[in-house]
Amino acid sequence: VRHFDAGKTIMNSNLYTTTIVPMMRTLENLLVLIDKAVAFAATKKTGEKDFTDALLNDRLVFDQFPFIRQIQIACDNAKAAAARLSKQEPPSMPDTEKTADELKARIQKTLEFMKTVAPESIIGNEEITITMPPYYKKQYGGETLSGYEYATQYALPNFYFHATTAYAILRKNGVPVGKSD
C-alpha cells in the first residue's frame, strides 16, 4: 500500500512500518517521560521518601497495574511483536525492575532487540500464522491469528494501552508532560 500526497509517494506502508517503527518511537518517548518524572519527583517529597518511588508504584485505580508494570508490559508487547512478526520467539526479560534507571535499561534492551529485526523479515508476513500464548485462548477464545490480525487486533492495541496508561499515571501525579510527549 502506498500513501500519496499530490501524486508523490510519501512512504510505503507495510507490516514493519505500521507496527515496529511506531512502537520503537513510542518506547523512545517513554524514556523521555521517565526522565521528566524523575526530574519532577526531585522537586517533591513524600515524608522521608523520594517521590520517584511513589510515581513508579502508583496506578490509576486500585485494580490496575502500577507504572512500573505498565512499562514492563509495553516492552513485552513491543519485543513480542518484533519477534512473532519475524517468525522468532520473543526473548525473555524477567520483570525485576524497581527503579527509573532499571526501567530505562529495560526499554533500551527492548529497543536493541527490535533494531536487530530486519524489516525484510517482517514485510509481507500479513498472512503468517501466529500461535498465541495459552492465556490468549482463555481470554479471547482463539489459538492463532494471522500476522495482520496479530499486529492490528492484539499487538498495537495492547502496546498503546500500556504506554498510554503509563503516561496517564504521570499526568495524574502532576508530572509536566503533554500531548507532544
Predicted ranges, named:
Residues V1-I10:
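Short, Lys/Arg-enriched N-terminal segments with co-localized hydrophobic residues
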Residues N12-R25, E48-D76, P94-K104, Y140, ...:
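Alpha-helical scaffold segments that form or flank carboxylate-/histidine-based iron centers
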Residues M23-T26, L30-L33, A37, A74, ...:
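Amphipathic alpha-helices that form helix-helix packing interfaces
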Residues L30-K45, A163-L170:
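Long, well-ordered alpha-helical segments
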Residues A42-F51, K87-K98, L170-D181:
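Short alpha-helical "patches" and their helix-cap loops
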Residues A42-L56, T116-A151:
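Acidic interhelical loop/turn segments
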Residues I71-F113, M132-Y135:
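Short, helix-capping/interhelical loops that line the mouth of catalytic, cofactor-
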Residues Y148-D181:
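C-terminal or internal capping secondary-structure element at the end of a domain, subdomain, or sheet
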